Amino acid sequence: MVEHRTRGNDREPEEAMTAHAHPPFDVELAPTLDAVPAFFTTLEPDSIADFRAATQRGPASLEDVIAGRPVELTDHTMTGHGGGEIVVTVLRRSDQDGAAAPGIYLIHGGGMVGGSRWSVVPILVEWVFRYGAVAAAVDFRLAPEFPDPVPVEDCYAGLEWFTGRAAEFGFDPRRLLIGGQSAGGGLSAGTTLLARDRGGPMPAAMLLMWPMLDDRNQTVSAQQIDGVGIWDRTSNETGWTALLGDRRGTADVSIYAAPARATDLSGLPPAYIEAGSAEVFRDESVAFASRIWAAGGSAELHIWAGGFHGFQTIVPTAAVSQRAVQTRESWIRRMLAE
């Protein structure tokens, strides 16, 4: 005899069993999770100071970062949102010829509450050396001391400042790649939306690495990554609440603060979007790419099986990390050559 059940009765036990299940972590990545500080998995508001201290350390030696390559760094103080000062580090080859180079504008991660430009300087040294680019890293001001719209407006001000000095620094602003990791990925998307809507300097390509896009924290992946991995759903709530306060999750959130809120993603440059299958930002990354495609735009999307948040930088020797980096580098090379 065949037992017939309603759809609701059939689905509810399954949903109850799988509500908090998460995709497995890659076998090369998983052991690292046992060694990370607890606040890298679950960040509570009272741990922000410790998290910030751990993510704002600069390199012990710039010479070690440059490692003998012909790359020079200069710091510049500029005016950010509301008249406050921010610092932009510009990197370029010391043996740069007279030809206009491609440009890279990279925004650091840290969940809107931590990190600094120094976290992306090492990768920019490599990209400047490898691609002959002129690059900039911006130190936007952090929440909760500087809530929305300060971070994204600081990033937009930095973009205007950098592109406005393209001739001085020797790069072609029409060949500019904007990008960022985690919060920096979300801020890159928000900054590009501001450029589109204000008629400002439009990047030629957009690199969103495991981007923080959606303040609502309601996707399946946001529910799955709870007390596990790196940057779980509680961390995400902490970061977004620091940025938005009581507005988090309400209708009173702009598309520039939380780009997943944007219903129209037309007019954006070609995008590269990547995330791990076992991280909070997986589903919002997929949705953002899908919305770009729906608007007739170009997006290359990669969801890496078994990857937790930021696995590419935390365990760079893992096979999946190396595949992810090689795939990303191939895209960057194509974008900067065009």
Give residue ranges: language-model regions:
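A glycine/proline-hinged amphipathic helix-loop "lid/cap" segment
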Residues: 1-93, 336-338
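Short beta-strand element of the alpha/beta-hydrolase
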Residues: 100-110
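Short amphipathic alpha-helix adjacent to the substrate-entry channel of hydrolases
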Residues: 118-137
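Alpha/beta-hydrolase active-site loop
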Residues: 146-166, 328
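Gly/Ser-rich "nucleophile elbow"/oxyanion-hole loop immediately N-terminal to the catalytic nucleophile
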Residues: 163-178, 198
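Hydrolase active-site cap/lid region
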Residues: 193-251
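Short beta-strand/loop motif that positions the catalytic acidic residue
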Residues: 273-275
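Catalytic active-site module of serine/aspartate enzymes centered on a nucleophile-bearing elbow/loop
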Residues: 316-338
